[in-house]
Amino acid sequence: MYQTLAISASQGPAPYDGSPGGFMHSAPSSPVYVPTTRVGSVLPTLPYLQGGGAAQPGHAPAGHVWSQPAAESPSYGAAGGAHPSGRFPYSASPPVANGASREQYGGGLAAREQYGALPRPLNGSYPAPYASYVGPQLGPAWPAAPFENSVLHCLQGRAAPIPVRAPSAELLEDLSESRECVNCGSIQTPLWRRDGTGNYLCNACGLYTKMNGLSRPLIKPQKRVPSSRRLGLSCANCHTTTTTLWRRNAEGEPVCNACGLYMKLHGVPRPLAMKKEGIQTRKRKPKNINKSKACSGNSTTAVPMTPTSTSSTNSDDCSKNASPSTQPAASGASSSVMSGPGESTSPESSNLKYSGQDGLYTGVSLTSTAEVTASVRQDHWCALALA
C-alpha cells in the first residue's frame, strides 16, 4: 500500500508540484483559482485517479485498499467539473489544458470588477450599469445632506433660549426678610394670613380675626381661681377663710359651706361654737363593694349558722369535729345558740343544732367559739353562708 504512494511520489515532480492536486479535490468548494495547465500535468502522475487497472500488478493484494478511491475517482477526474457545491453556486473550472479557460476566467473577473463598487458614492449617484434598473423608481441622485431633516432645521432655527420664569416678588421677599405678625409678633407660623389692611398675621391671629371679627387678645384669660384659694374672702358668719365651697346668704354675703348648709336646713345662723379648725369631709364608700367578702367572726357577737346546701356531704363536713359522746345529748334539742364569754362553756351548753333540719343534721357539738370559727372557715360553702 505504501509502495504505491512511493512510486507516485518518485514519478511525479516535486512535492510542491503535487500539492495542487489537493486543491483540485477542494476546487468545487474553494474559491481559490488553480491554473489548469499545472493541474493537467499533475493528473497523469497520480495513479489512483486513473482507475483501479492502472495500478501495478505486483501490488494486487493491496489493490482493494484503493478500490474505493478508484470508484470515486471519476467524480474528481475530468468529469468532476460538474460536481455541485453547497457553498458557492458556480462550478469549478474544467481541467482543460489550454489558455482559453484562463481567458474566460479572466473575463469573468473583469465582469465582477465593474459591479464591485456596490456602496453608494458620496455624491449620491449610482454607476452606469445600475442606471436602467434604479433610475425609474428612485431619483437621479440622493440629497447632498441626508441628516438635514425638519427636526434639525427646527432646532437650528430656534436660536433664542427658552425663557425661564423669574421668581415672584413675594418669594424674594420671603427669602430676604422674615415676616412678623402685626398682632402677636410671631415670626413662625404654618400659614401666613393678611388682615383687612394687608398686614401679615399668623395663622392663629388670622383665624381669630376671621371668626370673631376682632383682634386676637394677646393675654390669655386666667383660669378660675379655686374657691379655697380666693384671697380676701371670709365667711360672714364664722369668719373662716378655708372652705371647700363658697356660698351666699340671703343678703348676698359670702359664707362658708358649713354655715350656708346650716342656714339652709335650719333657717338660723350656725352657732360659732360649732366652728372647727379643720374641714370635716365625708368619707365616701367605694362604689364597687365586694359583697362576697366574708366578715371575720367576733367572740362577742353570735354568728347565725344558716346552711345553703341540703346535701348529705355538707352534713358530714359539719359533724366531723363533733365528739361522739355529746351527739346523743344534742339530738333532743330543737334549737341551739352559741355561748357567750360569761356563760358556761360546758359541752352540754355548747351543743349546736340547726333548726328545721332534724332529719339532715342530727347534731353538732363544738367545745369553743374558736373551733366554730375554724370549722366555718375550713368549709368551702361557709363563706357564702356568712355573707
Curated annotation (Swiss-Prot):
Q: Where in the cell is it found?
A: Nucleus
GO terms, biological process: cell fate commitment; epithelial cell differentiation; negative regulation of transcription by RNA polymerase II; positive regulation of DNA-templated transcription; positive regulation of transcription by RNA polymerase II
Q: Which Pfam families match?
A: GATA (PF00320), GATA-N (PF05349)
Gene3D superfamilies in alphabetical order: Erythroid Transcription Factor GATA-1, subunit A
List cellular component terms (GO). Answer: nucleus
Q: Per the annotation, which location comes first and is thus the protein's main one?
A: nucleus
Q: In which tissues is it expressed?
A: More abundant in stomach, and in small intestine. Lower levels in lung, liver, ovary and heart.
Tell me where the signal peptide lies.
Answer: none
Q: How is this protein named in the record?
A: Transcription factor GATA-6
Q: Which organism is it from?
A: Gallus gallus (Chicken)
